[in-house]
Amino acid sequence: MAGQKIRIRLKAYDHEVVDSSARKIVETVTRTGAQVAGPVPLPTEINRFCVIRSPHKYKDSREHFEMRTHKRLIDIIDPTPKTVDSLMRLDLPAGVDIEIKL
């Protein structure tokens, strides 16, 4: 797999879960002998919602909610077959969304 690059994007609502998952991936990749660039923190996506508290009237009384999506980017340069195999077997938490591009 010479000259290839694997790009991994992690997304989660909890920043601690994303950081621990990124740490696990980096440790696994360095143990198998490939080079790692990252984890690079990407901008946090914030979705804000404004909701009227009352179901009927009192429009002046509103409540604000927000959802934060934390993202990290990891590049694996020149992965070995052992690296790919160990990444496939890696057990990560359920709250993390993982995108892998070759």
Swiss-Prot record:
Subunit organization: Part of the 30S ribosomal subunit.
Disulfide bonds: none
GO biological process: translation
Keyword terms: Ribonucleoprotein, Ribosomal protein
Protein known as: Small ribosomal subunit protein uS10
PROSITE patterns to which the protein is assigned, alphabetical: RIBOSOMAL_S10
Keyword Cytoplasm included in the entry's annotation: no
Gene Ontology CC terms, in alphabetical order: ribonucleoprotein complex; ribosome
Its biological purpose: Involved in the binding of tRNA to the ribosomes.
Gene name as annotated: rpsJ
Gene3D superfamilies, sorted: Ribosomal protein S10 domain
GO molecular function term, any single one: tRNA binding
Matching PANTHER family: 30S RIBOSOMAL PROTEIN S10 FAMILY MEMBER (PTHR11700)
